Amino acid sequence: MAEKKEMKIAEVKGRPMLHWIGKQPLETVKSFPSQLVEKFNIEEAPQVPTFESLKNNWTNLLLHGDNREVLSTLLVNGFQNKVNFVYIDPPFNTGLAYVRKVKLRGTNKKLEGEEMSFDEQIMYENSFLESSFLQFMKDVLVLLSNMLNKDTGLIAVRIDYNYSHYIKVILDEVFSKENFINEITIGRSREAAGSPSKLEVTTESIYLY
């Protein structure tokens, strides 16, 4: 799809502000190459879409790629102020690697010298340096704030106790503390405390702006 190149991002001015080592403002974003991968449930041959044609008809659109690159590309190509509701469930930065089991025909053995059996694949690692995670989250939230409709847009951000206190301050900075609506507390599957001196983790939070 034909794409524009670059656009400037307005500085966020909400307060309070959270500071970390290496914090950088998101000043410009650029467009990344994209292509049609597949279309479903159509009666005619798919036409190669353009961003211009998608502006008024982009429901049921699944975008594959790094979220910052996808959001940047959409913004540069005219999707500012277009979205009414955003829900994100970002990594909680727990330091864990999440794997899936892949059953291989004919064997259940492990490869010699490997800690993980070869029928397990890492789906993603939930591990960032602290400053990298905070910068990643701020960049994503700034991009989303530019996509949300300024009059009717809402965003819901799900996070757990590991970083909820940091994310709340970043949300105040990006969306303004005055636009905070509520914190929704939701139950989660019970997680053993692992120590008599610790409490079980039973809830997560959704911040609504």
Which residues make up each language-model segment?
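Conserved Class I SAM-dependent methyltransferase catalytic core
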Residues: 122-185
